[in-house]
Amino acid sequence: MTMLETKTDPMVISMGPHHPSMHGVLRLIVTLDGENVIDCEPVLGYLHRGMEKIAENRTIVQYLPYVTRWDYLATMFTEAITVNAPERLANIEVPKRASYIRVIMLELSRIASHLLWLGPFMADIGAQTPFFYIFREREMIYDLFEAATGMRMMHNYFRIGGVAADLPYGWVDKCLDFCDYFLPKVDEYERLITNNPIFLKRVKDIGKISKEDAINWGLSGPMLRASGVKWDLRKVDNYECYDELDWSIQWQSDGDCLARYQVRIGEMRESIKIIQQALKAIPGGPYENLEARRLSKGRKSEWNNFEYQFIGKKPSPTFKMPKQEHYVRVEAPKGELGVFLIGDDNVFPWRWKIRAPGFINVQILPQLVQGMKLADIMTILGSIDIIMGEVDR
């Protein structure tokens, strides 16, 4: 029974868009009764840049540098989906070597993304030490990216029919050394974090999502797998060469913040397993499909004359997309990243719809925080792992 003297009116406060724990420019309008959350309304759109409309006024080759600005912490995945869509639409074959290189880059990007989720998530809860540890390992991944692509973050490495450049001399050995170094570090994170009583108090049984809710809300990625659903597009769709490698889906059944943390820690270990196998089994051959890079009139040209030598090495600016539609998806670190592409027998896509995992996953936030304490909002929002670049697009 509530005593009338102590009963207070609900208080409406605005968290963000500049609050450090909002992970970007997210704004939450929170209704509080004391310290208990009655209601929460996310306000999106502060980082909207019209990415879908830009795509409809650019060729795919011109659009490639833009896509790394969606999820700017896992840029390889946005590039992968951008080249996979026209490849599937036009039935362009990717050489085996290029496929293996892509898988290695994607998994390195997954580890980098999970590391940069883990550090700020722990800092939100109040643990500062892991925040500095994860930057040490993440820097090594960025060094590998810089050696292979020339860029630390916005790589612009994937191309229609392959990748931009082959792996440089000595890169494979360097990457294997990193894998051997990184696995014990994951154990170190676990020793430091998992059984810490303060950490467990903050995350156990907080923000629980049932299996049915996870499916009904359309959640994907670690959010879905932490609720007891063994669903990973790398196993389901078998894109690139994932079906040739031996690895297992990481999942938990509790559906709380702790389960989501455990899934991501497990995924980092599995990613290392995938990278090690791919590096050892990487075949020789071309790293791109040159046929995909010739101009449409170039198909009629001789293979060795001046015209081919001049234009055959450049990405084709007049690659026309057939008049059909296609939905392509990849398993990004945050969930299912998809693109619905409609071609119109033109160099520009007629429609380019982005299915951003963060946008779908953040919709369940109001349901999760109702009845919780104000401090739990940081924990729950952090465990969802959103990047506003892809939420607002």
Swiss-Prot record:
Keywords: Chloroplast, Membrane, NAD, NADP, Plastid, Plastoquinone, Quinone, Thylakoid, Translocase, Transport. Its EC number is 7.1.1.-. It is an enzyme of class 7 (translocase). InterPro entries: NADH_Q_OxRdtase_suD, NADH_UbQ_OxRdtase_49kDa_CS, NDH1_su_D/H, NiFe-Hase_large. Gene3D superfamilies: Cytochrome-c3 Hydrogenase, chain B (1.10.645.10). GO terms for biological process: photosynthesis, light reaction. Transmembrane segments: none annotated. GO terms for molecular function: NAD binding; oxidoreductase activity, acting on NAD(P)H, quinone or similar compound as acceptor; quinone binding. One of its GO terms (cellular component) is chloroplast thylakoid membrane. It catalyses: a plastoquinone + NADH + (n+1) H(+)(in) = a plastoquinol + NAD(+) + n H(+)(out); a plastoquinone + NADPH + (n+1) H(+)(in) = a plastoquinol + NADP(+) + n H(+)(out). It holds the Pfam family Complex1_49kDa. The keyword ATP-binding does not apply. It is a peripheral membrane protein. It is found in: Plastid, Chloroplast thylakoid membrane. It comes from the Eukaryota. NDH shuttles electrons from NAD(P)H:plastoquinone, via FMN and iron-sulfur (Fe-S) centers, to quinones in the photosynthetic chain and possibly in a chloroplast respiratory chain. The immediate electron acceptor for the enzyme in this species is believed to be plastoquinone. Couples the redox reaction to proton translocation, and thus conserves the redox energy in a proton gradient. PANTHER family: NADH DEHYDROGENASE [UBIQUINONE] IRON-SULFUR PROTEIN 2, MITOCHONDRIAL, NADH-UBIQUINONE OXIDOREDUCTASE 49 KDA SUBUNIT. Belongs to the complex I 49 kDa subunit family. NDH is composed of at least 16 different subunits, 5 of which are encoded in the nucleus. This is NAD(P)H-quinone oxidoreductase subunit H, chloroplastic. The lineage of its organism: Eukaryota, Viridiplantae, Streptophyta, Chlorokybophyceae, Chlorokybales.
